[in-house]
A protein has these predicted regions:
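Mid-length scaffold segments of soluble, non-membrane domains
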Residues: 77-155
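Bacterial Sec signal peptide processing site at the extreme N-terminus
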Residues: 16-35
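Bacterial N-terminal signal peptides
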Residues: 6-16
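A structured, mid-to-C-terminal "fold-capping" secondary-structure block
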Residues: 26, 131, 135-220
């Protein structure tokens, strides 16, 4: 289980709120809203409170913060080559080289990426939200495709989530076995969910949490 079913959408929701009314709606569609609401109720009202959230609580309470930071740095470092490629594909060689530098320094000097040496050495090399292949497709005007809520996964569109699968074709991600990839996704999902535990009430208090999560997904 990828365990990002609530973390990704909820995290973005807390950052951007419901300020979607003035955003560009081009390429967004929700033709399966009835099905999606059913899957949302399962993911957020059954799976999250009974499985995902308890795991996140245990992770926050019993795993030391330095260990959590190191694991987060390590999994993020694995994505740096793919982020570099996507920036080059988007015609931004400067940012591509930034992420090459991050990967090189953190892998060589940061114990394989457990320590963010690059970010500590230079503010311009701070860790940022990764640009994945879905972002590259969006850069060239490819639409999202239908919005879908998938069981055990959460928000999904063919462009952003399906397109992101292309990133697994680049090293280092291409070197991971399927169990390794599942482990990486699980760690990332648990950590993100743990960071949001104190903000659960904001989503629960929404008059329509499904719409809030859907719009937050498109505002990432």
């Amino acid at each position: 289980m990828k365990l990002r079913l609530s973390a990704l959408a909820l995290g973005t929701t807390l950052l951007v709120g419901c300020a979607s009314s003035g955003t560009d709606q081009q390429g967004r569609s929700d033709p399966l809203e009835g099905f999606n609401r059913t899957m949302y109720n399962f993911n957020f009202n059954v799976l999250d409170p009974y499985i995902v959230r308890p795991v996140a609580v245990a992770w926050r309470d019993y795993v030391p913060q330095p260990a959590r930071n190191g694991l987060s740095n390590f999994t993020g470092n694995l994505e740096e080559p793919a982020v570099m490629v996507n920036y080059f594909l988007q015609g931004d060689p400067y940012q591509g080289m930034v992420h090459f530098t991050r990967f090189f320094l953190n892998t060589i000097l940061g114990m394989g990426g457990f320590i963010d040496v690059a970010g500590m050495a230079n503010p311009k090399l701070q860790r940022t939200e990764p640009h994945r292949f879905g972002s590259t497709l969006g850069h060239y005007g490819v639409g999202y495709g239908p919005y879908v809520q998938l069981p055990f996964y959460g928000s999904f569109t063919l462009r952003d989530d399906g397109g992101d699968m292309a990133d697994s074709l680049y090293p280092v991600l291409s070197w991971l076995t399927w169990p390794m990839s599942v482990g990486k996704w699980t760690l990332e999902g648990i950590e993100t969910r743990a960071q949001l535990l104190d903000s659960d009430g904001l989503l629960r208090q929404s008059s329509d949490p499904y719409i809030m999560v859907r719009e937050a997904y498109f505002q990432r």
